[in-house]
Amino acid sequence: MKKAIVSSLSFCLAVTSFMNNAEEQKPKKLEDVQFLSITYTDFKHGKTDRAMEIIKNHYFPASKKAGTQVPYIVKFQSGEWDMATLWNLKNGYSSMEWEVTEEGIKWLKAFNKQEGKEKSKEIRDEFNSLIQRSNHVIGYHPTDIE
């Protein structure tokens, strides 16, 4: 019984404290940040080199030809993931409202022109077949940190 009373009292104090702070708070938008879309990728055993070959020899050249963003790639030497791909979300979270982006369309057109429509599909299918699993997150980098 004593534990129940102490727990209830602690909860009430925490809620009251939160409510007081909520009344004092004002909306605040994040400033000086760069929003990022980050994909962690784990390739099937022995397939990382082929995946990197496709990225360097096919995907990056198409990005450059299309004038679209070339992602920042991090290859891990430890941990559960083989690679992280980071994309700058130029329009912040609102970039995620698009099912198909203008930049994505430009890239695919350049990739199809570079490889041929049928070959481009084969390359994309092959790349996807190399992936064991992946995870996608959104975050931000404070740009006022040097």
Predicted regions and their residues:
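Short, solvent-exposed polar/charged micro-motifs at secondary-structure junctions
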Residues: T16, D82-T85
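Active-site-flanking beta-strand signature of metal-NTP-handling nucleotidyl enzymes
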Residues: D32-D42, A84-T85
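An amphipathic, aromatic/His-enriched active-site/gating alpha helix that lines ligand/cofactor pockets
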Residues: I5, P27-L30, N57, P61-Y72, ...
